[in-house]
Amino acid sequence: MIDKIICDELAKSSQESNVAVLLSGGVDSISIALAAHRLNKKITAYTFHLKDQPTYDAQKANEISNIMGWTCKTIEVPTDNVINDFIRLRREIQCVKKTHYECCFPFLYVYPQIKEKEVLSGWAADGYYGVSKKANIHYKHTKEKFDEFREDYFKLDHRAGYLWHKRIADMHDKTFITPYLTEPVKQFFWSKDWYELNQP
């Protein structure tokens, strides 16, 4: 069900036959890449890790790309210019919160490597599940409380730093496509309570 909704939303929003996918080892980004694959798009996956610090996510992104026949480019993010990078994030991207900096910093180096016009992402999908400590303690017990948590999470100025990431995409003249933030996907998840989404 959700895979069809994601495919439908991606078909509506993506106009290019060659697309970039921000790929990690997680199901959110993989589900977007698989949807693009089903739509017969040529996928170039982009993943990253800090210089000399390979990660599970980058390794898994390469593994799934090899299995699926996608090109995968791993970007090594340098750490020797962090002070200037963070100043740039404040001035150009308007980062304020710690999470803004953490989520945006690597993409200062990823986006210049992306050749495709459209950049697909599973951005903010984890917000639907309420897996944070805060959600587990305070919001999972009734659907009303769970919806309250999700309503706050998906406010425009939250969404896991979506607005700040999009500024980087815009700066590089890329179209940032996030199917998990579309209304039909939201409605699917909003029909479920915490237990339906998190228990077998």
Language-model regions, residue ranges each:
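ATP-dependent adenylate-handling active sites, centered on carboxylate activation for C-N bond formation
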Residues: 1-200
